[in-house]
């Protein structure tokens, strides 16, 4: 019998109690950003409108750098891949992800299930500090409120969203320097990544020794078919998430289980923190 923490408290927005959002200039000054092609350090180009590794250039959109591999962006039409047969395995992969993300992927931000989850996630993350990378950040101005004020925040998302600064790129190919982050966050995003093992490997790569991977996800007990799900690649069982983290050499430090905020009995909310020891 799975035991759950009892908690009916909901998240309350408070912009005064937020992590500090780093800017593009901050990221460049600290040498954090890397080319997704060469993994060389990125700097502003001479025209200050692009980033460059000295050979390849990367555009920005609303001051957010577009750090997809050039193999992908060279095939874009209006910022997306056309739904045509692709011979490249990378283009096939990105096209599958693009198709999956065309529907509504989250409960409304102010719905009770969303607010229950955000409170639980916020409580789970209370001990974090340093620079955190939010993989699949969605809305950074809201996401920063989930983390302690002593944190500095960078978000990465495959899409440009509302125009707030974030890195536009893939969690499976993080354009981030190795050993530079204090935490990597997957807040209900890991199940949207087809190759979630590679995404976790990338998270471990960019973490400093002692850094944390935080995963919040549904864990399924039954009815886990994907044949009726148009937006997720995975309906994880708990052992899949724990096994993936431990398989990468991480140590589980904290694990919390809550009843599904949508009151389903075939799944529950799982919150896990794991640390990098070497």
Where in this protein do the model-derived segments appear?
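N-terminal, positively charged/glycine-rich alpha-helical extensions of SAM-dependent methyltransferases
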Residues: 4-103
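Conserved alpha-helix/loop element of class I SAM-dependent methyltransferases that forms part
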Residues: 104-130
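Class I SAM-dependent methyltransferase SAM/SAH-binding core
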Residues: 130-173
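A conserved beta-strand element that flanks and buttresses the S-adenosyl-L-methionine
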Residues: 185
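Short catalytic micro-motifs in class I SAM-dependent methyltransferases
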Residues: 188-189
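A short glycine-rich, Lys/Arg-flanked "PGG" loop and its adjoining helix->strand segment in the class I
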Residues: 197-212
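Conserved class I S-adenosyl-L-methionine
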Residues: 214-242
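Core SAM-dependent methyltransferase catalytic element
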Residues: 248, 254-278
């Amino acid at each position: 019998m799975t035991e759950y923490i009892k908690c009916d408290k909901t998240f309350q927005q408070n912009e005064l109690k937020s992590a500090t959002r780093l800017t593009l200039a901050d990221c460049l000054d600290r040498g954090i950003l890397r080319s997704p092609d060469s993994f060389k350090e990125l700097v502003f180009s001479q025209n200050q409108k692009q980033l460059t590794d000295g050979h390849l250039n990367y555009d920005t959109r609303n001051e957010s750098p577009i750090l997809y591999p050039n193999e992908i962006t060279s095939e874009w039409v209006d910022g997306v891949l056309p739904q045509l047969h692709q011979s490249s395995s990378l283009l096939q992969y990105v096209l599958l992800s693009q198709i999956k993300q065309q529907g509504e992927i989250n409960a409304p931000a102010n719905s009770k299930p969303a607010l229950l989850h955000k409170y639980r996630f916020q409580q789970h993350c209370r001990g974090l500090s340093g620079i955190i990378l939010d993989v699949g950040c969605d809305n950074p101005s809201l996401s920063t409120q989930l983390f302690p004020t002593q944190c500095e925040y960078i978000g990465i998302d495959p899409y440009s969203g509302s125009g707030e600064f974030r890195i536009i790129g893939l969690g499976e190919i993080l354009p981030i320097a190795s050993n530079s982050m204090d935490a990597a966050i997957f807040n209900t995003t890991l199940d949207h990544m087809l190759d979630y093992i590679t995404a976790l490997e990338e998270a471990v790569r960019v973490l400093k020794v002692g850094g944390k991977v935080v995963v919040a996800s549904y864990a399924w007990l039954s009815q886990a078919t994907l044949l009726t799900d148009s937006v997720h690649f995975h309906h994880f069982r708990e052992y899949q998430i724990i096994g993936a983290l431990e398989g990468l050499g991480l140590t589980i430090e904290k694990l919390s289980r809550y009843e599904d905020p949508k009151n389903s009995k075939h799944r529950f909310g799982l919150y896990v923190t794991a640390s990098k020891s070497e």
